[in-house]
């Protein structure tokens, strides 16, 4: 009988997974670099880059931080995944996997803690919003963010309009010389659909009136309660987005680990 010869195929790196991971990460790299550039440009316009102490001078949140942090994380992840896949560099691929895995577990832990400690989270959110209410006039980006939130969720302050008493320009003390005394920002006002020109003085002296008289002119519900209501009303959409992000992260992890295994198998045959 003729001898049977068995042929073994040498292991090779899968091109599909390699270039899919490369393409997947180059998008994140570019987007991250764009966010980071926008953040640094915004800081440059505000003079923060020439005066780093300005970062700590602001009592509230500087929204530019979101662009810088998100852009920085996306840039680092995108670079490691992109170059690691293209150059078949196991160190960069492992770094990508560990970094992405750490972010995933931090997100998972944050979600669990937010569910378990709902009351504590609510109190912290109240405190966070009120700290930003105090700093409303200190930073234009923060001011625009608060105005957007109050208009979008039809709310005013953390718990209600009286939270604006925390701001030096809007408080009702006799020593306050501001024209905005006992008022609220225009973003708290109930807009008239027929009004073409925005009335930025609509909130002046409004808190001198009784609460029932305020209801037709300004939003009387707090932003924390309105945000919770929005989450409940859009729970399916929010959950879908979060699950989608988690699946993308798991998919990226699997691709990176599979590529590392292929590279190790090829190197083992050298």
Swiss-Prot record:
Q: How does it sit in the membrane?
A: Multi-pass membrane protein
Q: What is its main location?
A: membrane
Any Pfam family matching the protein? Tetraspanin
Spell out the subcellular localization from the entry.
Cell membrane
Instruction: Name any one GO molecular function.
Output: enzyme binding
- The glycosylation sites annotated in the UniProt record are 51, 171
Record's superkingdom? Answer: Eukaryota
Q: Which UniProt keywords apply?
A: Cell membrane, Disulfide bond, Glycoprotein, Membrane, Transmembrane, Transmembrane helix
What sections of the protein cross the membrane?
Answer: 20-40, 64-84, 95-115, 235-255
- Chain ranges sitting on the Cytoplasmic side read 1-19, 85-94, 256-270
Similarity remark: Belongs to the tetraspanin (TM4SF) family.
Q: What does this protein do?
A: Part of TspanC8 subgroup, composed of 6 members that interact with the transmembrane metalloprotease ADAM10. This interaction is required for ADAM10 exit from the endoplasmic reticulum and for enzymatic maturation and trafficking to the cell surface as well as substrate specificity. Different TspanC8/ADAM10 complexes have distinct substrates. Seems to regulate VE-cadherin expression in endothelial cells probably through interaction with ADAM10, promoting leukocyte transmigration.
Question: How is this protein named in the record?
Answer: Tetraspanin-17
Query: Which organism was this protein described from?
Result: Mus musculus
